[in-house]
Amino acid sequence: MRRIVYVSTAAVHGRGPFRGVRPGEAPVAPVSATSRSRAAAERHVLDAGGLVLRPHLVHGEGDRWVVPGLVGLLRELSATVSGCEALQSMIDVGTLGRAVVAAALSPRHGPGAHYVAHPDPVPASELLAAVCERVERPGAGAAVDVATAHARAAGSPRALHHLGMLTVDHWFADDGFWKDLDCSPGEGFAGTFARSAPWYRSYLATGE
């Protein structure tokens, strides 16, 4: 076996905020059981000389957490949320797949942990606007501020989790990763999300 590549998650660092954090700058401090298990798996891979990739938010076909969770939040609120400008590191699933293959085959990458995301972080307001425009628009009510949204979503832990995601920076910077792989990070959020929007609409309508 020439190389081990493990796709983990930036959630091994905990809840943030993280703004422009580079590899090695944030401690591994997982909060959830899932993140703790991934942090433990990372340790085994790194000890064996492997390569760990840490995406934050992965979107596109097959995503059953990020965008469906945001739609669930908007349904809970019957409105969108104003004042959400937190920056999120994002990557579409196709680009992530290319990055994994490139990392496995590249002769230039040694062991270690790297963030894998498009270099341009996405403001939460842009993410929300794209979901409302291309996937599902919430009820006709006016946008609500974060405090009101928190009160309305108080009975839904999942909705509160996604609301928290919109209000806390999770921006991880690792531009050298793409350069070292000689691999393009793709066109960015707007274009890739537009292509996956039909899949999201179908999934949310049918659950398949």
What are the functions of these language-model segments?
Residues 15-18, 62-64, 125-127:
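Short glycine-/acidic-enriched loop or helix-start segments at secondary-structure transitions
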Residues 88-94, 122, 172, 187:
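Residue-level signal for the nucleotide or nucleotide-sugar donor/cofactor binding architecture
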Residues 5-9, 54-56, 117:
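Active-site beta-alpha turn of Rossmann-fold NAD(P)-dependent dehydrogenases/reductases
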Residues 64-69, 82-105, 111-115:
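Substrate-positioning beta->alpha
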Residues 1-33:
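Conserved Rossmann-fold NAD(P)-dependent oxidoreductase catalytic core, especially the SDR/UDP-sugar
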Residues 99-161, 188, 194, 204-208:
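Mid/C-terminal beta-alpha module of Rossmann-like enzyme folds, strongest
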